[in-house]
């Protein structure tokens, strides 16, 4: 039994979110929540919310026992990038890339 949760268009870069996702892949959900709770990264809070949603989906939709759930899959794909302009000296301008990502978490029982 698998349950899935997604956060699309998360306002963090995929590269930064993957650092957090790699830490919880394959862990028991309770241990994964602990790791995310004490991580100082902004992406950890986003991934934690998606993991909590996946756990709730498993319990409500599939009737799964929370104590037996593990993080089966977690992956982060790139979302669209918003391009902005930052004015600089002497009439120049720099491009600012505001990146987004799609975070997906799949939990399954052993």
Curated annotation (Swiss-Prot):
A GO molecular function held by the record: structural constituent of ribosome
CDD domains linked: Ribosomal_L22
GO cellular component terms listed in the entry, alphabetical order: cytosolic large ribosomal subunit
Any one biological process term the GO annotation gives: translation
Keyword field contains Ribonucleoprotein: yes
Keywords annotated in UniProt: Ribonucleoprotein, Ribosomal protein, RNA-binding, rRNA-binding
SUPFAM superfamilies linked to this entry: Ribosomal protein L22
Gene3D superfamilies in the cross-refs: Ribosomal protein L22/L17 (3.90.470.10)
UniProt-listed InterPro entries: Ribosomal_uL22 (IPR001063), Ribosomal_uL22_bac/chlpt-type (IPR005727), Ribosomal_uL22_bac/org-type (IPR047867), Ribosomal_uL22_CS (IPR018260), Ribosomal_uL22_sf (IPR036394)
Chain's role: This protein binds specifically to 23S rRNA; its binding is stimulated by other ribosomal proteins, e.g. L4, L17, and L20. It is important during the early stages of 50S assembly. It makes multiple contacts with different domains of the 23S rRNA in the assembled 50S subunit and ribosome. The globular domain of the protein is located near the polypeptide exit tunnel on the outside of the subunit, while an extended beta-hairpin is found that lines the wall of the exit tunnel in the center of the 70S ribosome.
Subunit (UniProt): Part of the 50S ribosomal subunit.
The family this protein is said to belong to: Belongs to the universal ribosomal protein uL22 family.
Protein name: Large ribosomal subunit protein uL22
Organism lineage: Bacteria, Pseudomonadati, Pseudomonadota, Gammaproteobacteria, Alteromonadales
């Amino acid at each position: 039994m698998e349950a899935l949760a997604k956060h699309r268009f998360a306002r963090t870069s995929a590269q930064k979110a993957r650092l957090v996702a790699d830490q919880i892949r394959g862990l028991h959900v309770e241990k994964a929540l602990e790791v995310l709770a004490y991580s100082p990264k902004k992406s950890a809070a986003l991934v934690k919310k998606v993991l909590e949603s996946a756990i709730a989906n498993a319990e409500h939709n599939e009737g799964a026992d929370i104590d037996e759930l593990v993080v089966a899959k977690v992956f982060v794909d790139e979302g669209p990038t918003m391009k902005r302009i930052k004015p600089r000296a002497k009439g120049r301008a720099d491009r600012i890339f505001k990146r987004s990502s799609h975070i997906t978490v799949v939990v399954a029982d052993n």
